[in-house]
């Protein structure tokens, strides 16, 4: 009987441990920023300060600002050679190169007769953009070169009752549209996959088709309907924002970036 009890405890502890992802602390980088955007494959840091986008390399900082388009809503650095900047107040996007020079003229969705209220946008592949508009509460895939809509979903309440999202994140294979309670997933062709429940999550990031989010100051990985806690190697950090790139996790606490390496994902 004691042996059985011991085995139950051992298995329970193993299961709990298996639901965690271990990390090791790498370094701490001071950063004076209003918003930490992320880090690209070369270790360059992107951030917002005074409504200006900055890219910090080892020995140089590039900057971009556009006072005519209002406040920057979001920046997508998935492709560092084609950075997407979204200005929600003016219903406008533009693309920047790796030195933060404009690649395109601003694209105004009202002028393109797409939507009056574009709320969230994320990069896809092949010059496509995932877009959410509160006008009709749908998710759309739009090609910014051909100016054609490739896919439009059903109204999102069709997939989840009373669902009204606040943001979008995507990989090149999948898109996640979410609020702080629910996330809906669609594949690259617009087919609905599933949905998961979240716990007060306001930040999600894809990394190699794996989704990470922060809930109550703890980072989790979501995969196959399960969540795994990311253990920050005994560091107690107030998570203002975070970013995941390959095998590294970057956490911004408002004054510094804490860099961790995943021991196993």
Predicted regions and their residues:
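Bacterial Sec-dependent N-terminal signal peptides
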Residues: 1-25, 265
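Start-of-domain marker
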Residues: 20-82, 88-90
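Surface loop/turn motifs at the tips and blade-to-blade linkers of beta-strand repeat domains
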Residues: 26-32, 63-68, 107-114, 152-161, ...
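Repeated scaffold domains used in trafficking and secretory/extracellular systems
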Residues: 31-40, 69-77, 114-122, 160-169, ...
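Short beta-strand elements that form the blades of beta-propeller/WD-repeat-like
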Residues: 35-48, 81-87, 93, 122-133, ...
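Structural signal for beta-propeller blades
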Residues: 53-54, 92-93, 137-139, 183-184, ...
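Short loop/turn segments that connect beta-strands within beta-propeller blades
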Residues: 56-60, 97-101, 143-146, 187-191, ...
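Surface-exposed, polar helix/loop patches in the mature regions of secreted/periplasmic/lumenal proteins
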Residues: 85-147
């Amino acid at each position: 009987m004691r042996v059985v009890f011991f085995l139950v405890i051992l298995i329970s502890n193993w299961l709990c441990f298996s639901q965690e992802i271990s990390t090791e602390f790498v370094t701490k980088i001071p950063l004076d920023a209003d918003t930490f955007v992320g880090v690209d494959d070369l270790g360059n840091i992107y951030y917002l300060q005074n409504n200006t986008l900055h890219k910090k390399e080892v020995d140089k900082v590039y900057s971009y600002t556009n006072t005519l388009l209002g406040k920057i809503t979001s920046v997508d650095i998935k492709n560092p050679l084609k950075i997407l900047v979204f200005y929600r107040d003016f219903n406008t996007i533009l693309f920047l190169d790796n030195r933060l020079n404009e690649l395109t003229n601003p694209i105004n969705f009202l002028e393109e007769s797409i939507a009056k209220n574009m709320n969230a946008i994320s990069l896809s592949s092949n010059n496509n953009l995932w877009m959410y508009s509160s006008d009709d509460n749908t998710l759309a895939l739009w090609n910014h070169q051909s100016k054609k809509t490739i896919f439009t979903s059903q109204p999102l309440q069709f997939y989840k009752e009373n669902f009204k999202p606040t943001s979008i994140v995507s990989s090149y294979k999948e898109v996640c549209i979410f609020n702080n309670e629910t996330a809906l997933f669609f594949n690259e062709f617009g087919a609905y996959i599933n949905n998961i429940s979240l716990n007060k999550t306001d930040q999600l990031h894809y990394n190699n088709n794996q989704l990470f989010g922060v809930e109550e100051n703890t980072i989790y990985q979501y995969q196959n309907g399960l969540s795994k806690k990311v253990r920050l190697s005994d560091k107690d950090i107030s998570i203002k924002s975070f970013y995941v790139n390959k095998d590294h996790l970057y956490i911004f606490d408002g004054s510094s970036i804490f860099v961790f390496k995943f021991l196993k994902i």
